[in-house]
């Protein structure tokens, strides 16, 4: 088995010291702006790339209806997470955020209320994006796993649809995951222990603190060990077909049966993508001898998630992809696993 040492391993927990930081909401807004991004996107489906500059300058900020208090903007969320990552890993290289958005909400200023949409001038139109996701990589912390270079990565997701903007200012919901990105394909490797799906915050400073705590508790070495373990097992074509068939069947099971099986969030369209890429994927397709490693199987799922998930479900499905793959691997080892149903 490959060594599980992370290179380099040195970092200092920053939670206590960072609590003394003040005015974090102001300092993080001036994060360096992305001017051009030629990297492969970490999520593709139903989303478009945007720069931090555009988020800051071209988008309005929604308010809570009953007290007119502003929400935490997308750029503030990105800035708080970016600053926490820089402070936690002080001696490492931190890449610029890669940002994706979807579900644009358009509006107009009051003076243009009676104009037709075709008559609106640029300064009379407003917009913001309901959903936003960003990815920040740390390329100096990496590990080679099953022949692929993985680099440390943090992903944040925000959907204003999760907040009650019709009420008064209250804690807003954010999701953050720390894990790895496969540099071969830019698939995210998210583990449930590095994923916080319901962070509540009313200021960028609170997001900053939540991010530091998540980074401090994340067990990087164990995550790498689990990912490496997937390379030790192989699926025959018959086993692969059986598992995909059970995945298709899962969502149609009677509730009494489904309750006895661990949750699976892989959709029918994702299953179709995995089947299609079984022979076609340049990096993770079946070998000439007809075998597919569980590592390759896992990456086919994360690739399908990258190409087929909406922003607001992206992290849930990515984390579930690893949970499901590890569970099936346990079943293949004849261990007591609730996932045995998928291979029997």
What residue ranges belong to the model's regions?
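Intrinsically disordered, low-complexity regions enriched in serine/threonine
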Residues: 1-36, 115-344
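Feature for intrinsically disordered/low-complexity regulatory segments and propeptides
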Residues: 1-82, 86-93, 97-105
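A short acidic/basic microdomain associated with nuclease active sites
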Residues: 88-134
